[in-house]
């Protein structure tokens, strides 16, 4: 639950430093910069950098735009790693453990290996493997990320299922031959979310 988690991290920062800001707007703007920042890597405008670097660049820009000043470098770096400390949805850990009883379960995220490992350790997420865009030096939806995970698992594409809350991610995986499952997160982007409220018809399973 990235949105609630990051907003809470911002509020904790305000409590500790006295620096005030529109933290809901900052969080939403930060997420809005997510895909555009990765696209510059994907289209060759810049060399590979991991998501922590992209997140920090976006954060610095947004802080200036919102006129939020006075953060020390230490506070800035701590806020930037809020993405390492996200809290899971209430059904996540139980659901992963149920899946793990019958299947091998892995991440396939644009987050870095360090980010995913920190999150797993903090929240007791029982991954068998941690696959990241950093593993393949490609951000989703590049084919190298999806197919790279399939290769690492020593599987055929039809033997691997991507489970996600985002139709665009699932449709990309589907286009490369993976099975797909949609999990609804109706408030991921806030109470007024108006997309990713149901699976597209092409998705194999809707949970």
Give residue spans per PLM region.
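Active-site neighborhood of HAD-like aspartate-dependent phosphohydrolases
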Residues: 1-32
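A structural signal for well-ordered alpha-helical segments within the folded catalytic domains
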Residues: 4, 53-57, 144, 171
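Alpha-helical elements of Rossmann-like donor-binding domains used by nucleotide-donor carbohydrate transfer enzymes
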Residues: 5-12, 29, 57-61, 78, ...
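Short helix-capping segments at alpha-helix termini
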Residues: 15-23, 65-71, 123-126, 154
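A generic structural motif
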Residues: 19, 102-104, 178
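A metal-dependent, Asp-based hydrolase signature
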Residues: 24, 29-77
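Substrate-recognition element of Asp-dependent hydrolases with the DxDx(T/V) motif
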Residues: 73-122, 130-133
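Asp-based, Mg2+/Mn2+-dependent phosphohydrolase catalytic module
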Residues: 97, 111-207
